[in-house]
Amino acid sequence: MNKPICIIAGVGEGNGYALAREHERKGYFVIALSRNISKLEALFGGINTENVAAIACDLSNTDSIHSMYQSVLENHGKPSLLIYNAGNALFDSIDNVNINDCEMAWKLNCSGLLSLSQCMLPDLESASNPGIIVIGATASLRGTAKTLSFSSAKSAQRAMVQSMAKTLWPRGIHVSYVIIDGVIKTSITSDYFPDKDDNFFIHPESLAKRISALSEQDKSAWAFEIDIRPFKENW
């Protein structure tokens, strides 16, 4: 394949879909991953289009990740960019947390990222302009009373990505972390916040443009971490 290949892990209606379309617009062939293949098919109008391949993958399962990546290599080629957008925003506290939910949060945010990055590493090292972009959240910086599972997993993810960056930057692989500080506009969040106007939300298309710019940075001025929020967000 002549086009560079980008894997977007964790594609749904919001920023995952916007990231796929933004990188398609920039000339990438996009591998869109989700556990639910029917949702991907609905989003993209099919599981294989000219510039997008939708593939089912359970990012909490190492075997599923390895099988998916082998299929990508056999059918499409070697990717040069990973955008890891998987996660699950749980609301729980020490009073009601389920240890299984806590473990699943870690698997999606940390184990899945590690497994997929390890699969891709040999191909990234031989690629032109290789990168790993991980989508985080404010929960990576601090916990709240009701985000025990989510904040513990996200803070572990952020530390892991820092470690990855310190290893891989000298080898020419740009690893970066994006902290999302706000509510992304989707049909679900719009229904959940019916009294909020557009200024309350982060718009997925605008977010995707900011994130995609990370893979265009010159090596002399790489950013590791950026935070993105709407202008009215209280921070």
Give the location of each predicted region.
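Active-site loop of short-chain dehydrogenase/reductase
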Residues: 3-4, 78-79, 93, 124-137, ...
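Conserved glycine-rich cofactor-binding loop
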Residues: 12-14
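Conserved glycine-rich Rossmann-like NAD(P)H-binding loop of the short-chain dehydrogenase/reductase
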Residues: 26-42
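Rossmann-fold cofactor-recognition segment
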Residues: 47-63
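Substrate-binding pocket helix/loop in short-chain dehydrogenase/reductase
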Residues: 93-94, 98-106
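Catalytic loop of short-chain dehydrogenase/reductase
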Residues: 131-156, 161-162, 166-169
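C-terminal helical subdomain
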Residues: 170-173, 177-179, 193-235
